[in-house]
C-alpha cells in the first residue's frame, strides 16, 4: 500500500503512454498531472526522445525543472536545483551520437545492412513519419548519445546486425515506432536508479517508485520500479516483466493517456 502523500517518484514513458500515439494528446492525464504536482510528486519523463524534445514537452506538461531521462537512458537531464552535481545540466552515458553514426555508416557500407536513420533525412520527412510539426521534428534530430532508425531488412539480417552491434559495445532497442542504437552501458533502468539514488541522498529516505510504459524498451525501467503500469500499446511484442505480481503490476484496458489515467486510478484512487 502506498499513497501520493509519502515520498514518491513517478517515471513515465511518453509516446503511447502519457501521449497518444497518433495525436500526441495528453489531456486525459491532465487531472492526475495536476494532482501530483500539487502533492509535490515529481513526474520524471523517460523516453527515446532527445533531451531537446523532452524539455519542450516538460514545459507543455507543467513539469519544467524536474529531471528527465532521454534517449532510452543514454542522457539524464538533471533537475534545476542539482547544479552542484558534476556534469550539470546533462549526464551522457557511453559514446556519442557522432561515434555511433560512424559505426552504423561503416556497417551499412561494408556489410550492406538496410536501414534509414534520422540523420539520413530532413525534418520534413520526419514530420511525415511522425505527424509532428516541422519545428518539433527538427528537435528529434538533436541526438547526443543514440541513433534512431527505421529497419528495412529481414529479421535474419536484424539478428546479424544486433550481434555485430553487441560485439562493438552497442545495443539495438525497439521502441513504439522506431529502433534505437545506443551504448550497451546505457539504459532506462540505470538512469532511473541513478535518479532514485540522488533523491534518496538528498532526502535521506528512498522514495517509493511507480513507472508507466507501453513498449518493449520500457521493460527495463518497469523492472526496477516498486509498482508498474503497463499501458496497452500498439507494439505487437508488448511488455513482459520477470515479476508480474498483480499487487505490483497493472495492465490497462485503455491505451495512451487514458491508460495512464487508468493506471494512476488503480494504484491511488482506491487507497
From Swiss-Prot:
Its cofactor is Mg(2+). The active site is at residue 13. One of its GO terms (biological process) is mannosylglycerate biosynthetic process. SUPFAM superfamilies: HAD-like. It is found in: Cytoplasm. Its EC number is 3.1.3.70. It comes from the Bacteria. It catalyses: 2-O-(alpha-D-mannosyl)-3-phosphoglycerate + H2O = (2R)-2-O-(alpha-D-mannosyl)-glycerate + phosphate. It holds the Pfam family Hydrolase_3. Keywords: Cytoplasm, Hydrolase, Magnesium, Metal-binding. Disulfide bonds: none annotated. One of its GO terms (cellular component) is cytosol. It is an enzyme of class 3 (hydrolase). InterPro entries: HAD-like_sf, HAD-SF-IIB-MPGP, HAD-SF_hydro_IIB, HAD_sf, MPG_Pase. One of its GO terms (molecular function) is magnesium ion binding. Mg(2+) binds at residues 13, 15, 214. Belongs to the HAD-like hydrolase superfamily. MPGP family. This is Mannosyl-3-phosphoglycerate phosphatase. It comes from Escherichia coli (strain K12). The lineage of its organism: Bacteria, Pseudomonadati, Pseudomonadota, Gammaproteobacteria, Enterobacterales.
